From Swiss-Prot:
Name of the protein in question: Dihydroorotase
Gene designation per UniProt: pyrC
Superkingdom of origin organism: Bacteria
Pfam families for the chain: Amidohydro_1 (PF01979)
Lineage, broadest ranks: Bacteria, Pseudomonadati, Pseudomonadota, Alphaproteobacteria, Rickettsiales
Coiled-coil stretches noted in the UniProt entry, renumbered to this chain: none
Organism: Anaplasma phagocytophilum (strain HZ)
Record family assignment: Belongs to the metallo-dependent hydrolases superfamily. DHOase family. Class I DHOase subfamily.
Length: 447
């Protein structure tokens, strides 16, 4: 556990009375700079004041801390940036709220969440954006960012410029794809001028309509309509052809799940197009057979695919084709997941399990720890051009301390999230968040 003691001194040599914290005996890992050493980190107010290798005396002549946190050799890294979160406000407060979702994020070491716009009403105008920002200020203990919608509820394109001015980091219709090719091309054109990303839920609904799990052996065994892998790859292929017409635009594939789509992204990157993509832990840890064991808790969109697809996701992470890991945190009320699988809700929660599940790539799949952590911190921040996900003097102190070797069992009953829908209930994992810091303030501490 993280230990601490209190002194009540000020920075010597000045009149600053901001709260100061010294994190000592830490294994500092910063993927953005390649840093990995035992050392210390100092914060003052909301910012990182200094950090470095070796021993640090928090009561020395140069610095006396308001608080000293002994990390006991555990990893201290930048806070996790999750690009794909559904906090459900406004309109879905029975599933999740900004308050409960942000506490779930803090418990998972996630210091920045990027909300998807498929709320009720949709995040398609400045009024809804202002509402979300107000709720974040009132209730959130982590940084809340958001995507704006590409299209309005009436099917017309959103005013992307005004939404960007209101704080949108990019644009997507996640939950559904932008099916209209002309609208997608226009979105690329506007986004190129605004220098923001367009993110796509890659699915051709004409092929997937009515499907509930992957089209394959399991869907046939259960007699369920399946969602074919080409519904994803055809949409990715179409979008990349459109991107060639607007080569300065940035295209991001959300929750990629198939080898076919990944191969298309890999080729586009080699071509020099601005294409990035993300993958969820469930798509690199589980395959379609999980539906037989976990039932509705293993129903999500895109669905769990074949074992070949799952292994290709790991290969994509290893070779850099997949840029980052995101949760697609999709909370649902219990009654929405206890209906028959053919008609229950898609989606699972993921904020509180993101780090340990991602660490399975390090513990079990042979990826370097630096590579795994980069896909949770600096890489997602770069995609949406946020000055977060790294450790540097003067940056906001968003930090996570975690025990790399701690073994524990996932218990959804203990989640801070309002919803408990996860196929990882009862799974033994290794790696536990001990403390989460947002803007210099501790917002979560393990019991």
């Amino acid at each position: 556990m993280v230990s601490e003691r209190q002194t009540w001194s000020l920075l010597q040599g000045g009149q600053c009375n901001e709260y100061t914290v010294a994190y000592i005996n830490a294994r500092i890992i910063d993927p953005a700079s390649g840093t990995d050493y035992k050392g210390y980190l100092l914060t003052r107010g909301k910012e990182i004041l200094d950090f470095g290798p070796g021993f640090f005396d928090p009561n020395g002549a140069a610095f006396a801390a308001s608080e000293v946190v002994d990390c006991n050799g555990h990893v201290l890294m930048p806070g996790i940036v999750d690009l794909h979160v559904h906090l459900r406000e406004p309109g879905g407060e029975h599933k999740e709220t900004v308050d409960t979702g942000s506490r779930a994020a803090a418990a998972g070491g996630v210091t920045t969440v990027v909300c998807q716009p498929n709320t009720i009403p949709r995040l398609e105008n400045v009024l809804v954006a202002k509402y979300l920002k107000m709720r974040a200020l009132e209730s959130s203990c982590v940084n809340i960012e958001f995507y704006g919608a590409v299209t309005k509820s009436d099917g017309e394109l959103c005013d992307m410029a005004s939404l960007k001015d209101a704080g949108a980091l990019g644009f997507t219709d996640d939950g559904l794809p932008v099916m209209n090719a002309l609208y997608m091309k226009r979105a690329f054109e506007y986004a190129q001028d605004l220098d923001v990303v367009v993110a796509q839920h890659a699915e051709d609904c004409n092929l997937s309509d009515g499907g509930c799990i992957n089209e394959g052996l399991v869907s046939r065994e259960l007699g369920l309509k399946g969602i074919p892998d080409i519904s994803e790859s055809i949409m990715v292929s179409r979008d990349i052809q459109l991107l060639r017409e607007v080569p300065g635009a940035h295209y991001h594939v959300l929750h990629i799940s198939t080898k076919k789509a990944l191969d298309i992204v890999r080729a586009a990157k080699r071509e020099g197009l601005r294409v990035t993509c993300e993958v969820t832990p469930h798509h690199f840890l589980l395959n379609e057979s999980a539906v037989l064991e976990h039932g509705t808790m293993a129903k999500m969109n895109p669905p769990l695919r074949t074992e070949e697809d799952r292994l290709s996701m790991i290969s994509g992470l290893e070779d850099g084709t997949i840029d980052c890991i995101a949760t697609d945190h999709a909370p649902h009320a219990a009654q929405e997941k206890t209906r028959p699988i053919s008609c229950c809700a898609f989606g699972i929660v993921g904020l509180e399990t993101l780090l340990p599940l991602s660490l399975e790539l390090y513990h079990n799949a042979g990826m370097s720890l630096m590579d795994v952590l980069s896909k949770l911190t600096s890489k997602p921040a770069e995609i949406v051009r946020l000055p977060r996900g790294k450790i540097a003097k003067g940056l906001v102190a968003d930090l996570v301390i975690f025990d790399l070797e701690h073994v524990w069992t996932i218990d959804t009953a203990k989640f801070s999230s309002k919803s408990k829908n996860s196929p990882f209930q009862g799974r033994k994992v290794k790696g536990k968040v001990l403390r989460t810091v947002v803007s210099g303030k501790t917002v979560y501490r393990a019991e």
